């Protein structure tokens, strides 16, 4: 059984994809396009891999054909080995590897580039986003009656299982962002989101852009839906972020996104077909 995998210089490029165990491209094969892809960014999450992948598979099997794209953001522990060890049990599992750490937005971007499905869902690799929420996120986008311009379904956490300091800082940041960007989102930091792949790839790409998906999708004329999702403590290890570090970066990001929204020029177009007429 082969695992689909590739090692990519950061940022990843889609033409690096091969179907192979580890990094080689021997035994390449073409598989049918799945209905949706689940992107899981990971950095030093060795202890969480097995449980999280198993939960994703259990949640997604009733929904449709899918692939799981784990993006290893240059982990220094055994995350890669833990993913490779699951290859025989989960043929839908793929592995993308950064050659140097790029952060969560870079990992999401690489995963979406590598994904083959038209609909993409993402969740954090630390296990705090319970995978049983995935069908709720995917349902509106996979429905036969889905609105044509529905581009993003964003999760909003209910009953967050974080420290008091983290919850308070997040609440302040969300209120400030909502006031400035007017994106109608209560919890833009939630890692559970589902979206159209083509819509995502047309967004401006920058570090930390995953925190501003509702505003960015709306900027491009897409409809955004929100659903409540559950939350739980990390499965293992500690957070890779600090409240102070996130706040300092967030100020600059917020200013930049506000500038992007103001500078957006949108116009509707339609092609007029010209037919040849006889002289």
Question: Which stretches of residues belong to each language-model region?
Answer:
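Conserved donor nucleotide-binding strand/loop of the catalytic core
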Residues: 66-69, 80-114
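A conserved acidic beta->alpha catalytic loop
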Residues: 72-81, 127
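Hydrophobic helical membrane-anchoring modules
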Residues: 2-33, 182, 207-279
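Acceptor/aglycone-binding surface of glycosyltransferases and processive sugar-polymer synthases
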Residues: 96-114, 119-122, 128-211, 232-252, ...
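Conserved sequence signature across two-component system core domains
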Residues: 42, 71-73, 98
